[in-house]
A protein has these predicted regions:
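Active-site proximal loop and beta-alpha junction motif in alpha/beta enzyme cores
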Residues: 1-112, 124-176
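Short amphipathic alpha-helical face segments that pack within enzyme cores
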Residues: 117, 121-125
Length: 176
């Protein structure tokens, strides 16, 4: 969820789309976090970085990437008192200044293979911490995407595929 924000997308190749995910926010009240603190190094073991990409994210940068028990740690961080609306949780390993490996715990869902907003949040957190360049490849369990933080927002570029077809009725399209 991106809080009902309209996202701009464009085709940039065959089965490749870029989406402007918006301008990231870092102020404690925008994420939101329960108290006024520096969001670059949150006061949680591991000192994760807090970011909002229209939804809250908490990114840990770790070396021992594969041995993280997401099913145990994910819900603990998601429901931490610091996050009044709960949070998405990412564990990231910097592979080089242009590439990051990520595992995701999505709030309300659990372990997920991929997440666009999590990919953007991790990239932005890595850039804020001066670990990477503004344009990085994010490798997730479900595939890889490119994230490019520009002045007009964070651009997410990745593969697209047809997943379903259907017809929407006029009643479905009416807004209340």
């Amino acid at each position: 969820s991106t809080d009902g924000i309209i996202l701009i997308a464009k085709n940039v190749g065959v089965n490749l789309t870029s989406v402007n995910m918006g301008v990231p926010k870092f102020e404690w009240h925008d994420i939101p976090i329960s108290k006024k603190i520096n969001t670059l190094k949150l006061p949680i073991e591991g000192h994760p970085t807090g970011t909002s990409i229209g939804n809250p994210h908490c990114t840990f940068f770790v070396e021992d990437f594969e041995n993280i028990d997401l099913n145990k740690i994910g819900p603990e961080i998601e429901n931490h008192p610091l996050f009044p609306e709960r949070t998405n949780v990412q564990f990231a390993k910097i592979l080089d200044p242009n590439r990051i490996r990520v595992r995701v715990w999505e709030r309300g869902t659990g372990v997920t293979l991929a997440s666009g907003s999590s990919s953007c949040a991790v990239a932005v957190a890595a850039i804020r911490n001066e670990f990477t360049q503004n344009k990085v490849t994010v490798d997730l369990d479900g595939g890889s995407v490119e994230v490019n933080w520009q002045s007009d927002g964070v651009w997410l570029t990745g593969p697209t595929a047809h997943s379903f077809s259907g017809t929407l009725t006029k009643d479905f399209l009416k807004y209340e």
